[in-house]
């Protein structure tokens, strides 16, 4: 084969001839055939069949061929005649296949091309096949959809042969007009890069069938007048229009396209860095050397000048030569070295090994390059030995790659801003790509960094040793990770793989990066901790069940939505004995209480620490450690916060606790708690719903509730403090929900809150001998409670019912409609029947016969910044603050006492209270909540009754 032939010159002004054009076309076809042969030879026997038969399955709509859908699917490739090898391949697939004459039927398809790395130095066994299938511009939408479905079916067939095939269906006129119907996926660049992709197509494509590129016939120096030249060729019939397909010229890359293209290559670089680094640097080179010829133009000029040597025209060789010529000087030596390593690893051809059958030309070409680079055999051996790369090697290389990718993105982004250009990428695409970049590269607190984005085949270690720093003397805390450390004494001289203050974080990092597998031998030197090999083995099992390795990249659909948690794994008490202080005393359980949050007679909370591992929809893994303060409540609060934005899909919560010290019981209790809390807050796939959730733990009470989308909690040290808090006013109806183990000593209160209803005032009572406990749940769910002596049910209820009736009546008078008015007062008795506590409805017991006595009313007044005071009216007798000052309560008590017989001893009850609308000086309250009236009623009654008792 002649590598260099006579140059061809086309002078559109002086005249051209058809013979020269045919000679030029044949020269491009010669280069094309060499590339096809190279692409074919790089495939296995079964894979070669896919490449051979591709044009035929679209040229014929034959039911025996792969991808067939129905008889209406468009077919037929312009000017295509299958070769004997193609027909034989079809008959190997379907013995009944025979080629039929289609007559003069107009083909539906214009051309088919293979583009990218096949047939080039950059092709490897992992490379996919990207095919452009171009249809007629007048093809109906239904036909286009059918072709797309056929392409998808064909891709599934090719996958069974070990080929990753992607067929993109479009027409050339849509491409020229920028109307391509694509979005960002793993295989095409959406709106990100039009001209850069066309530049790549022209220099890498292999013509498979149909019309030839019109671009071949337009000299490189005439790209600026491409359309005029093309029209002259067609109008003057130098070529037949149906023989050529026109994707348009690439005179230059528009500046506004660089940002989109850069982001796209970063997107690809997350999973396939070597190719993307080369392309990203080419984009930067193009951006910095505007005015210089593009690689596609250099390729075309070389063919016009007589160059047909496939080695010298290899797209990756040309790309490298362009970058090498651009990166000159010692200050860019490290970047040039990264380019060389990227090209070598992209080729995927280990030169230090002899198994290169079928790859002789690639091995020869690659060897020429590395010889010119001056690489030593040690450098080659290091790159060829990727199977033995360790975490430290990958971490260093990843840092270099991330720095280069980040540098490229920032530079291109700045250039786009400086030129004031609008990036040639849609807002949706750039948002999507940015999210993937963020998920892969962004560092943030707690995120587990994944260090091996396709750099090494595996980082699995045979032996890993976890050493607590206290093993090395002193009081240092934290953990060190070693490999192959049989003798602990060698730790001082062995390199540390990783340091962490947290054993769980170290384990998760090892697992997510593939260092730790089920076959890895473990060694633990726990020091002051009590961690063990068995605990780490159990933790590994929990991690494997929670998150299969390797972690797949997030799907496009997930990245198009906001990030949300998919599932959580809670590791409880890692390396901790929660009963250590009891064990030292020889005590394990001092009562029948088996709640892990209030264990034994001491009500001990056995949850000391939690490591919360979260896997989210962008496939990020994060770990948050809780070991100080209210560990469990803090973790619960953060889980609630993460769910609030997406309540329709609750994340799964798994809990693991080592079997030491009631581990399974602790895990079960924590899992129950999280399920119990999430359920009412997000019932029905909506929320967060307004409610207050009460948890009893470690001799304290915790009340959880949301403020908007933000959860918060209040810790209360006693039952009395809890009741005071439940009585506080609310902005809206907030029912009280108790955890299944909370307040088991107060079953009546649980029954009261369970029976609570909105827009009602409910009075509950329980009589125990001569004492009664009353609870009032008001219209917004506040719970006010008190105890009092009881002589009869009527004497117990009538005072409070009349007080509430007066309050409701006054509200009715203030409102012109029913909005904001409670339905009324309902009475319930708390009883225990069949071992269960329940609230049973009791009609109001006021018989209509008035109780003896007179009305006692209080009217609250605010004077300036002074505290709230009350004027009190006993029947028609007024006692004002102005007149009595601090002696008002004693004066009222003395007056009431004077009206009673000397032997009468019973409490006084207020029948009504008026509160000012500026009770809270910060706001004007149109309707003051019932619980606030009850609070001031209780304060005044207690004060009056104390003074009554003193006057006896």
Spans of features found by a protein language model:
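Extended helix-rich, non-globular scaffold segments
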Residues: 127-135, 141-143, 161, 182-188, ...
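Catalytic metal-binding acidic patch
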Residues: 113, 120-147, 164-169
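Basic- and aromatic-enriched surface patches that contact anionic nucleotides/nucleic acids
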Residues: 152-153, 173
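Well-ordered mid-protein domain cores that form the structural environment of catalytic cofactors
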Residues: 67-126
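Short, conserved secondary-structure transition motifs
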Residues: 163-185
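Amphipathic alpha-helical scaffolding segments
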Residues: 129-135, 139, 146-152, 340-341, ...
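Nucleotidyltransferase catalytic cores
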Residues: 1-91, 178-182, 188, 195, ...
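Arginine/glycine-rich "motif VI" loop of SF2 helicases in the C-terminal RecA-like domain
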Residues: 156-162
């Amino acid at each position: 084969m002649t590598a260099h032939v006579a140059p061809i010159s086309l002078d559109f002004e002086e005249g051209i001839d058809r013979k020269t054009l045919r000679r030029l076309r044949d020269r491009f076809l010669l280069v094309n055939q060499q590339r096809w042969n190279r692409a074919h030879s790089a495939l296995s026997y079964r894979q070669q069949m896919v490449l051979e038969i591709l044009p035929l399955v679209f040229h014929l709509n034959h039911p025996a061929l792969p991808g067939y859908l129905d008889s209406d699917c468009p077919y037929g490739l312009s000017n295509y005649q299958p070769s004997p090898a193609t027909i034989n391949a079809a008959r190997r697939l379907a013995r009944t296949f025979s080629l039929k004459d289609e007559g003069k039927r107009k083909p539906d398809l214009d051309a088919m091309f293979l583009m990218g790395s096949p047939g080039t130095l950059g092709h490897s066994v992992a490379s996919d096949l990207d095919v452009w299938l171009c249809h007629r511009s007048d093809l109906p939408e239904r036909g286009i959809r059918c072709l797309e479905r056929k392409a998808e079916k064909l891709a599934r067939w090719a996958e069974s042969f070990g080929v990753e095939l992607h067929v993109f269906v479009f027409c050339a006129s849509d491409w020229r007009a920028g109307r391509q119907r694509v979005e960002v996926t793993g295989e095409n660049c959406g709106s990100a890069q039009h001209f850069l992709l066309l530049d790549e197509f022209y220099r890498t494509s292999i013509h498979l069938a149909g019309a030839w590129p019109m671009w071949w016939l337009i000299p490189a120096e005439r790209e600026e007048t491409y359309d005029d030249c093309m029209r002259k060729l067609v109008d003057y019939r130098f070529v037949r229009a149906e023989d050529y397909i026109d994707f348009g010229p690439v005179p230059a890359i528009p500046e506004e396209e660089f940002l989109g293209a850069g982001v796209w290559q970063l997107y690809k670089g997350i999973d396939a860095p070597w190719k993307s680094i080369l392309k990203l640097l080419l984009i930067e080179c193009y951006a910095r050397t505007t005015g210089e010829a593009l690689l596609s133009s250099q390729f075309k000029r070389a063919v016009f000048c007589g160059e047909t040597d496939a080695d010298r025209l290899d797209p990756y060789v040309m790309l490298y030569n362009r970058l090498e010529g651009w990166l000159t000087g010692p200050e860019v030596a490290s970047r040039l070295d990264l380019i060389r390593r990227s090209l070598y690893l992209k080729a995927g051809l280990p030169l230090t090994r002899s198994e290169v059958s079928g790859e002789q030309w690639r091995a020869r070409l690659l060897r020429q390059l590395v010889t010119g680079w001056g690489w030593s055999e040690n450098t080659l051996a290091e790159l060829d030995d990727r199977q033995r790369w360790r975490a430290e090697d990958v971490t260093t290389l990843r840092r270099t790659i991330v720095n280069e990718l980040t540098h490229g993105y920032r530079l291109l982004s700045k250039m786009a801003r400086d030129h004031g250009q609008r990036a040639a990428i849609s807002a949706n695409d750039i948002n999507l790509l940015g999210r993937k970049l963020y998920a892969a590269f962004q560092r943030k607190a707690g995120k587990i960094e994944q260090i091996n984005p396709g750099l090494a085949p595996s980082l699995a270690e045979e032996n890993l040793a976890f050493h607590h720093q206290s093993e090395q003397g002193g009081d240092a805390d934290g953990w060190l990770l070693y490999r192959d450390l049989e003798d602990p004494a060698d730790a001082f001289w062995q390199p540390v793989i990783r340091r962490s203050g947290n054993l769980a974080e170290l384990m998760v990092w090892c697992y997510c990066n593939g260092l730790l597998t089920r076959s890895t031998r473990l060694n633990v030197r726990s020091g002051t901790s009590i961690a063990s090999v068995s605990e780490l083995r159990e933790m590994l099992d929990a991690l494997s069940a929670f998150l299969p390795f390797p972690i797949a990249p997030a799907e496009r659909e997930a990245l198009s939505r906001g990030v949300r948690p998919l599932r959580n794994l809670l590791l409880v008490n890692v390396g901790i004995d929660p009963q250590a202080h009891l064990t030292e005393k020889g005590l394990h359980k001092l009562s029948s209480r088996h709640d892990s949050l209030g264990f034994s007679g001491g009500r001990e909370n056995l949850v000391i620490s939690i490591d919360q591992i979260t896997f989210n929809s962008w496939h990020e893994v994060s770990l948050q450690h809780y070991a100080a303060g209210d560990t469990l409540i803090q973790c619960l609060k953060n889980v609630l916060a993460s769910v609030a934005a997406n309540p329709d899909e609750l994340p799964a919560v798994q809990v693991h606790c080592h079997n030491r010290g009631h581990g399974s019981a602790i895990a079960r209790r924590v899992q129950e708690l999280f399920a119990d809390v999430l359920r009412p807050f997000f019932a029905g796939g909506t929320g967060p719903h307004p409610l207050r959730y009460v948890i009893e733990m470690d001799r304290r009470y915790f009340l959880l509730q949301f403020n908007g989308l933000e959860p918060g909690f209040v810790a209360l040290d006693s039952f009395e403090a809890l009741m005071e808090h439940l009585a506080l006013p609310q902005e809206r109806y907030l029912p009280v929900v108790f955890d299944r183990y909370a307040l088991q000593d107060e079953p009546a209160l649980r029954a009261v809150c369970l029976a609570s209803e909105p827009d009602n005032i409910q009075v509950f009572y329980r009589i125990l001998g001569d004492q009664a406990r009353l609870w009032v749940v008001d219209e917004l769910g506040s719970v006010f409670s008190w105890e009092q002596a009881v002589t009869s049910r009527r004497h117990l209820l009538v005072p409070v019912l009349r007080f509430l009736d007066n309050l409701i009546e006054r509200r009715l008078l203030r409102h012109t409609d029913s909005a904001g008015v409670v339905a009324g007062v309902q009475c319930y008795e708390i009883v225990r029947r069949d071992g269960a506590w329940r609230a049973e409805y009791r009609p109001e017991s006021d018989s209509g016969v008035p109780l003896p006595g007179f009305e006692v009313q209080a009217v609250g007044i605010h004077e300036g910044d002074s505290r709230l005071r009350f004027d009190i009216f006993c029947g028609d007798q007024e006692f004002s603050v102005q007149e009595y000052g601090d002696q008002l309560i004693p004066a009222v008590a003395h007056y009431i006492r004077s009206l009673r017989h000397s032997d009468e001893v019973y409490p006084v009850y207020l029948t009504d209270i008026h509160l000012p609308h500026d009770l809270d000086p910060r706001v004007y309250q149109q309707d003051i909540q019932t619980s606030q009236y009850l609070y001031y009623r209780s304060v005044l009654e207690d004060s009056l009754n104390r003074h009554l008792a003193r006057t006896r």
